[in-house]
Each structure stands twice: as C-alpha cells, then as structure tokens.
Regions:
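Bacterial N-terminal signal peptides that target proteins for export
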Residues: 1-9
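Bacterial N-terminal signal peptides
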Residues: 8-19
C-alpha cells in the first residue's frame, strides 16, 4: 500500500512539474483574433449557458462578462459534467461536447491531477470557454494552471488554463464543498480513461 501511495505521489509531482511551464505561459501573445464569424458572442454563450445550467445560472452573466472582458470572444466552448475530489492531492474527471462554429462538434473527455492546499469534493456542470483553438484536434493537450477558488454549494467558479497559446476558461457550478488552492492540469482525450496523467 505504501509503495502505491509513493507511486501516485511521484506521478502527481511529475505531472505538476510538467504542467508548470504551461501554466507559466500566461495569456497568448497578441496575434490577430480569429475571424469574427467563427467566434461566439456573449449572447450566444449566455443562451447556451442558461439552457445548460438551468435555474442556477443567475450569476452566469457576470462571470461570462468577466471572461469576455479578459480574453475576448471565444471560438469554441465545451458543455459537460465532471467530478473531483481532493485531500492535498486530487483528481478530476469529466466529459462533454466541444462546440465550434466552423469546425464541427466533438465529444471530449478530460482528466487531471492536482496538488496543493485543497480538500473536499464536488460534482459540477462545466462550461469551458475555448480561445485560439486552431482546429478541434488541438484540444487534445495538457492545459496547466493554478486554481484558487472556493466552491460553495450551488456557486460558480472560474479559472484559466493554457497550453500552446490556447486558453480554456472553465466555469463551474456544482454541488459539494471544496476549499483551497492547488496547481494541476487537465488532459483532454478522445476516449474516456482512468489515467489522469
């Protein structure tokens, strides 16, 4: 049992060290935004979000407005569900559908480890705004970032993850209680897998 705990701890540390350079990339350099007809307007995002989140979406307009003011209009978004749990080290698993205007829709799965001062569990509906996605296959990447949110029962949380100039902004509304700050990454795959690394 101890050997397994050591192996999992070593794997999480390796994953965090691998994700750190991606997290340090920050916002993508300015380089012409995608054509406006391939991006989603704030109204389109709100309509999709209200349909998806339902009655808990009162704060959605404010959180989408904040994301749009920081990163502009996305050229894709993901609607899905996920579950996560942590006590110092954590895991997150999810699945959803990536929507784009000009590259089609795509079923995606995500997994990821995290480590930090973090405890709790949650089940969440997730809307991820996707920026600078050159094609749907480019989503299959590890996106690193720092998560420092408090998830309250029925509340919203927003973070940012980045890899290869693609920015993901997960917006979560869920059931559970999770408090803390952690560093980790999300890995996107075309098929479901239990391997978070």
């Amino acid at each position: 049992m101890r050997a397994m705990i050591r192996l999992v701890t070593a794997a999480l540390l390796l994953g965090v060290l691998t994700a750190a350079p991606a997290a340090a990339q920050g916002a993508p350099p300015p380089g012409g935004p995608p054509p406006s007809d391939s991006r989603f307007s704030s109204n389109e995002l709100l309509n999709a979000g209200h349909s998806f989140f339902g009655t808990v979406s009162r704060g959605l307009a404010q959180i989408v407005e904040k994301a749009v003011s920081q990163w502009g209009l996305p050229n894709g978004y993901i609607l899905g569900e996920e579950a996560a749990g942590a006590f110092i080290a954590g895991l997150r698993y999810g699945e959803g559908m990536l929507y784009t205007k000009n590259a089609g829709d795509l079923k995606v799965y995500w997994q990821g480890p995290s480590i930090g001062f973090d405890a709790g569990g949650e089940g969440a509906r997730t809307m991820m705004l996707v920026y600078n996605l050159p094609n749907t296959g480019a989503i299959y990447e590890r996106f690193g970032g720092i998560d420092g949110s408090a998830y309250f029962i029925g509340g919203f949380g927003m973070t940012a993850l980045t890899a290869n100039n693609i920015v993901l902004v997960p917006i979560r509304s869920g059931v559970g209680l999770r408090l803390g700050a952690n560093i980790g990454y999300l890995k996107f795959t075309p098929k479901a897998t239990w391997n978070p690394l």
